[in-house]
Amino acid sequence: ADDYDDEVLPDARGHRPIDRKREELPSLRPAPPPISGGGYR
């Protein structure tokens, strides 16, 4: 059940196969702020 788990629905489970490439530089641009407050500006 672990063989096809990663190749059947990688993005469906939220493994972010394409995101892992862009997440290489998460510190480069703080565009997506983890704070939902929006008042820390």
Curated annotation (Swiss-Prot):
Any domain commentary? A long coiled coil structure formed by 3 polypeptide chains connects the central nodule to the C-terminal domains (distal nodules). The long C-terminal ends of the alpha chains fold back, contributing a fourth strand to the coiled coil structure.
Q: To which species is this protein native? A: Oryctolagus cuniculus (Rabbit)
Question: Which Gene Ontology biological process is one annotated for this entry?
Answer: innate immune response
Task: For the region Beta-chain polymerization, binding distal domain of another fibrin, give the residue spans.
Answer: 14-16
Entry protein name: Fibrinogen beta chain
Keywords from UniProt, A to Z, are:
Adaptive immunity, Blood coagulation, Coiled coil, Disulfide bond, Hemostasis, Immunity, Innate immunity, Secreted, Sulfation
**Where does the record say this protein resides?**
Secreted
Give a yes or no for keyword Coiled coil in this entry. yes
Chain positions with Sulfotyrosine modification: 4
Describe its partners and assembly state: Heterohexamer; disulfide linked. Contains 2 sets of 3 non-identical chains (alpha, beta and gamma). The 2 heterotrimers are in head to head conformation with the N-termini in a small central domain.
Annotated site residues (Cleavage) in this chain = 13-14
